[in-house]
Amino acid sequence: MQENNRYRLKPHEIVVLKKMRETEARNVLVIGDLHEPFCLDGYLEWCLEQYETFNCTQTIFIGDIIDNHYSSYHETSADGMGGADELELAIRKISKWYNAFDEIGTKVIIGNHDRIIMRKAQTSAIPSKWIKSYKEVLG
């Protein structure tokens, strides 16, 4: 008797799917929009709890790690932090996330807030050779 194949999978695809289901969990924790240094208090702890609760094996940050409020194309708050202060505080806070999720397989996607410095440089016709990499800035 042939197995019900309601997904219309090819025989080799069924074998691959069954093998995947037999192996250990491959749950991915997706973390979005930290906007450091303005991240919600307790978000790191909540994310760590979800990682454990759902037996995650990988973490993906989906952008906007840094807020870069001071450099927005939109109006910024006159009472807000300056660029150096915001960046230094963001680096300190991001290091906590790095230490919490520093495992093989962690991925970081760069978001529009993360890219704003390069966008501003392009707007000002500054060659990319003058711009540091994220790794150089964040350590």
Question: Which residues are covered by each model-predicted region?
Answer:
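Core catalytic region of metal-dependent phosphoesterases/phosphodiesterases
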Residues: I31-G139
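Acidic, histidine-bearing metal-coordination/catalytic regions of metal-dependent phosphoesterases
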Residues: M1-I31
